[in-house]
């Protein structure tokens, strides 16, 4: 199961010196590969989740990585500086955010990105369990992020999936 996650993280083209925010880290499957890549330089990873169970799980999974810190709570309530991250990762989590709160969360994530930073999002698009691609694009655009690239793919478990990269272009 690690290979698809590794390939996805490979698509980030990390040099090892980036500061990365993993929003909704859950079990740390993506986080582990990011932390590993960042060890080659002076990079750092921040893992955020609203679940204490997941934060404890990821801390155990990533205990050998000194370049990781963990934050428990809603991103809207956490003390995280704006313009602090080169990359924000949103992996299969946006559909778990209440619809009426999605724009607020995406706006906050966009503020956390440095100018020229990138937001990578992978999200199921099924009507019953996902976020439509058109909604994802609208959320990102409203937050001031510009689509660099995107594609639709298929996952055995999640069905149709949107993969996108959005840039924070300074005004």
Regions found by a protein language model. Name each.
Residues 1-7:
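Conserved SAM-binding loop and adjacent beta-strand
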Residues 21, 27-77:
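Class I SAM-dependent methyltransferase SAM/SAH-binding core
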Residues 76-88:
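A short acidic, Gly/Pro-enriched loop at the edge of an enzyme's catalytic core
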Residues 87-100:
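A short SAM/SAH-binding and catalytic strip from SAM-dependent methyltransferases
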Residues 103-115:
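A short glycine-rich, Lys/Arg-flanked "PGG" loop and its adjoining helix->strand segment in the class I
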Residues 116-123:
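Conserved beta-strand signature within the Rossmann-like core of class I S-adenosyl-L-methionine
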Residues 130-143:
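Short alpha-helix
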Residues 154-171:
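Core SAM-dependent methyltransferase catalytic element
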